[in-house]
Amino acid sequence: MTKQLILENVSFRYGKTGPWIVDHVSCEVHSGDFIGIIGPNGGGKTTLTQLMLGLLQPVCGKIFTCFTQENRPLSIGWVPQHFAYDAAFPITVKETVLSGRLATLPWYGRYTKKDHDAAEEALHTVDLLEYKDSCFSHLSGGQIQRVLLARALSARPKFLLLDEPTANIDPSNQQKILQILSDLNKHCTILMITHDLHHTAGCFNRVFFMNKKLTALADTTTISERFCCNTFGKCS
C-alpha cells in the first residue's frame, strides 16, 4: 500500500520554552487506512492534525506526504470540530459547500459548472441535497456537521481528516456520518479524532492513543482501558 503520510519524530510547542504539545510522534498512514485517534482533552490531537495539514510547522522532526504543496489543499480534506459563522449572514448550504472549492478557483474567482456539480455531488453523498438552498444557520447540529463533511468532499480529496465529527450531535446523525465515512473509505484514506469509543471503535482498522505522544493500540479492550487510565487516572 502507498504511504500517503509519514511523521518522523515530530514535536511541536508554542514559543521556545512552552510545554511540548506534540512530543516525538512517529507514524505512517497508508492508502485505504481508517485511523482513529483517541485521548484526553489537551493531549495534542487537534495540533497533530494541523501539523499534518501544514497549518503548523514542526519545531523538530519531519513530515512527508505523497501530495505536493500545490495539490495538498485539494488532496487532503479537513472537517473541523467547530466552524465559525455569523448566524445573521444568510449563507446557503450550497454556498457553504462551495467554499470548499476555493483552492480550485481561477484568478478571477468565479465558480464554474464543475464547482457547482462537485458541491451538489458532495451534498448528495451526505444526503442533504434537498437542503442546498436552505440557510446554513437554520440547520441542526448534526446537519451542520454533515454539511462540513460535504464541504471537505467537494474538492474530491484522497485523504480526509476529521476532528470529532460525531461530537455533541444526535444518534441518528452520528450513525449517518459513520456510514458515510465507511462508504467513503473504499476510495479515501480517513483519519479521525474521536472521544466516542462506543460507536466508532469498530470503524477503524488502526487506532492510536494520543497524549503528547502517540501509541498504537491493538484492540477495543486495550483502547478502553488506556483511555480510562489516562483520562481519569484509574486503571482496572
Swiss-Prot record:
Gene3D superfamilies for this protein: P-loop containing nucleotide triphosphate hydrolases (3.40.50.300)
Cell location: Cell inner membrane
UniProt keywords, alphabetically: ATP-binding, Cell inner membrane, Cell membrane, Membrane, Nucleotide-binding, Transport
Entry binding sites for ATP: G39, P40, N41, G42, G43, G44, K45, T46
GO cellular component terms given for this protein: plasma membrane
ABC transporter domain mapped to chain residues: 5-236
Membrane topology label: Peripheral membrane protein
Recorded GO MF terms: ATP binding; ATP hydrolysis activity
Family membership: Belongs to the ABC transporter superfamily.
Its job: Part of an ATP-driven transport system TC_0696/TC_0697/TC_0698 for a metal. Probably responsible for energy coupling to the transport system.
UniProt-recorded name of the protein: Probable metal transport system ATP-binding protein TC_0697
Organism of provenance: Chlamydia muridarum (strain MoPn / Nigg)
